[in-house]
Amino acid sequence: VSGNRVAKTRVTIHASPDEVWNALTRPELVKKYMMGADVKSDWKVGSPLTYTGEYKGKRYEEKGVIKKIEPHKLLQTTHFSTTSGKEDTPENHALVTWELHPKGDATVVAVSQAGIETEKGVEGSQANWNGVLEGLKKTVEGAAS
């Protein structure tokens, strides 16, 4: 992780942490809100995690390693995108943390991405994560209704 800036965003989803967790870890649900990406992992600490797909006509791969996992509560991974234009070295991998907090009959989902080098990078990352969280919310709330 080379940068010291962090992008953070959150959303409240009207569903249980279990339902949200399923949407984070089940490939057929991830595909609905993560720009059509195919996710692969066995969801264990130390295991690889990859998202592959096509964006604006170009193939991409985003990858990382699971650092921490507490089902229905926390998922922390490293993250590297082949579209970043950077070399695939550990210092160019960001750290992404998903936290699920029950709140009544809803779940607050907080996402942070650490290791960003510029304020412009923070803004771009937050916009990206806001879009992902909106899609996650629609996917989960649509499935729950």
Positions of the model-derived regions?
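Tryptophan-centric aromatic hotspots in well-structured domains and transmembrane helices
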Residues: 21-24, 43, 79-81, 125, ...
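Hydrophobic ligand-binding cavity/cleft-lining segments
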Residues: 1-40
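A conserved amphipathic terminal alpha-helix motif
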Residues: 108, 114-145
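Hydrophobic-ligand binding "helix-grip"
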Residues: 39-42, 55-104, 108, 114
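Extracellular beta-rich ligand/substrate-recognition surface
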Residues: 1-4, 52, 56
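Residues at helix-coil transition
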Residues: 25-26, 71, 141-142
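Hydrophobic pocket/interface hotspot
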Residues: 20-21, 30, 49-51, 66, ...
